Regions:
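Glycine-rich phosphate/pyrophosphate-handling loop used in enzymes and phosphotransfer proteins
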Residues: 1-187, 191-222
Length: 222
């Protein structure tokens, strides 16, 4: 209700063309979603379907990425995360939705949980809001099945190797895992892949047989 009222009082402008009404107008959204990201997020090889080629062994079974973290996509993500533009949740869910294939009925959407510090700063869990929107579009359940360990701090300035080593201790299961379900982890940015690998590994160790991943944007080039 508040978001609708705010949209009337202070309407958004399209981040790409400037048209009044929404963060990304229908024409610009159609244009952006038509430009599919077709590279493996780990090595940059051209792929046909998902964004992970067959040469990499990971704790997750498939990965989809909407695009690179640049231009309009970068601005939408950054404003959503750092400037409390909550309306961006629906737009980012649309971008993820456009990249994903048909999903089976046994899929459960699992957001990467934000840190307590960022929750206090933003006032919301940014990936949980996107998970709710995506679940609504796909008519699938979402569950916050991952919990961050309170004694582990994420350091973004560390080297890739150090981040991957540290990431093993990021998460623990928040509740019971059904081995008959497929779990789709969603996150906003893929950099080294350490966070999603740790999340997938956590779910697998808790009993999940199949874990897939969907991310909005790849930061930098492989």
């Amino acid at each position: 209700m508040f978001d609708k009222l705010l949209a009337i009082i202070a309407p958004h402008y399209c981040y790409r063309c400037g048209k009044i009404g929404s963060i990304l107008c229908s024409n610009c959204k159609k244009y952006i979603t038509s430009r599919q990201y077709t590279s493996c997020v780990l090595c940059g090889r051209i792929v046909k379907k998902a964004n992970l080629c067959g040469t990499h062994r990971q704790s997750y079974d498939a990965l989809w990425c909407f695009g690179l973290r640049q231009g309009v996509i970068k601005k939408i993500i950054d404003d959503y995360k750092f400037h409390r533009v909550r309306a961006a949740a629906a737009v980012l869910a649309d971008l993820l939705d456009s990249r994903l294939p048909t999903l089976s009925d046994d899929v459960v959407i699992v957001p990467i949980p934000t840190t307590s510090k960022n929750m206090r700063r933003r006032g919301y869990d940014h990936m949980l809001l996107i998970a709710k929107q995506l679940a609504k579009r796909r008519n699938l359940p979402y569950r916050p099945l991952l919990r961050r360990r309170n004694n582990v701090t994420q350091h973004f300035t560390k080297s890739s190797k150090e981040r991957k080593r540290q990431a093993r201790y990021f998460f623990e299961p928040a509740s019971m895992i059904d081995p008959d379900k497929t779990y789709l982890i969603i996150d906003d940015i893929f950099t080294t892949g350490a966070t999603i690998s740790a999340a997938a590994d956590c779910l697998k160790k808790a009993g999940a047989k199949r874990v897939e991943v969907a991310v909005i944007a790849r930061h930098g080039k492989p």
